[in-house]
Amino acid sequence: MKEFIRSQWMKAMRSLAAAEATLDTDPDSAASRAYYAAFHGVTATLAGRGMEFTKHTAVRAALHRDLIQSGALSAHLGRDYDFLLDLRETADYGGVAEASLASATKAIEKARAILAALQPLLPDGAV
């Protein structure tokens, strides 16, 4: 299980780095990568608690149920995750709607904050 947790956490770090690298040239990609940074970070954290999911909606539900409602994470981080998910859907599937530079910048900041809050929740030695 630690290998899976480590893999997911490293994907989170790579996604955050990709978001930062593409911000100025492609805000849509940056917004999408920021969401995936948070998604993989949450997936790693939930796996550390013995939970695995295959759907984005299941990860979101578990985040709110098992990490937010339990008090392990602040409620504002749940709202931030929802913001990232909504923006990713706009960036990836919005047609003429796009993520702005400002919203993509905000997404990166929120993803970074989520990952910072998640890291202490990971099992010892997992990353």
How would you describe each model-predicted region?
Residues 1-127:
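Terminal alpha-helical segments
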